[in-house]
Amino acid sequence: MQTEQLLHQLFEKKALNQQQTEFLFTAIVRGQLDNSQLSAALIALKLRGETPEEISGAVTALQADAESFPIPDYPFADIVGTGGDGANTINISTASAIVAASYGLKVAKHGNRSVSSQTGASDLLTALGVNVHISAHKARQALDEIGLCFLFAPQYHLGFQHAIPVRQALKTRTIFNILGPLINPAKPKRQLLGVYSSDLIQPYAETVARLGHEHSVVVHGSGLDEIALHGVTEVAEIKAGQIERYTLTPQDFGFQPQPLETLRGGKPSENAQILTALLQGKGKLAHQQAVAMNSAMLMSLFGYPNLKQNAQAIMDIIATGKPFETLQQLTQY
């Protein structure tokens, strides 16, 4: 009965509070809504625009339903985007996670198969010989030992399967597209979060603040769900519940802008070749710089605030080829 009341509230264009949304999404991941109810709920949320309270409630429900991951007591982060920006670039956040781990940061990367591009994080890692289906225990071991693990979303969020038919039928973005980066089963309190639209920056930032992150950043880079090498990046930085908005350019990292065309990716096999060259220090300069900018911002969440110094440190470590060794180590788990 309560589910029907909540659906009625949505149809009246009234927002749900966090607790109500948590109840509704718990019902969704348990398969308690039929496809027509679920479809109607997702469309009602989309047309009105999801509030931070609603996004937070959905995240809480999905995290409670997720398979557990042994959360470490040391600082670690995630770098992840919503996808869906339609730009079909190389996998910048996946490369940045590997490079940042090579620098000595701890990164629990949450990811999935491709949404709208040709190559999602798991597609790429599989092409590189990484087993994305390892157990939570094994993944934690990798995080402890080499500073990097990959958590494959469908393995932890089994309840998502109930929404797949409706999402495929709707063929449009729904709240599920924006939940992915926020439901890492390791529950990192430091995240570099990329969003596909600048309209999402503020609600995302407010959601992150509600969820109690220690230090996270939400970015949208001139059409990309990453920090942009080709233009201006809009930023919301969340620290201790406070949100600060500002913009960044490539010059803030010590680089000159490069055309977006230089970052175009392709199929998993093509992106794997591009990433291998990059991690070996043999990649295109634009690829290295794009990864350095995103890794530099990730470093700032660990107490390294100087973005130019960070970017240079990352360029130096890429030149050594050490990130490729980190990738090789990851394939052993």
From Swiss-Prot:
PANTHER family named in the record: ANTHRANILATE PHOSPHORIBOSYLTRANSFERASE (PTHR43285:SF2)
GO biological process: L-tryptophan biosynthetic process
The species this protein was found in: Pasteurella multocida (strain Pm70)
The UniProt record lists the keyword Glycosyltransferase: yes
Matches recorded under InterPro entries: Anthranilate_Pribosyl_Tfrase, Glycosyl_Trfase_fam3, Glycosyl_Trfase_fam3_N_dom, Glycosyl_Trfase_fam3_N_dom_sf, Nuc_phospho_transferase
Cofactors demanded by this protein: Mg(2+)
Entry's family note: Belongs to the anthranilate phosphoribosyltransferase family.
Record's protein name: Anthranilate phosphoribosyltransferase
Disulfide bonds, paired cysteine numbers: none
Enzyme class: transferase
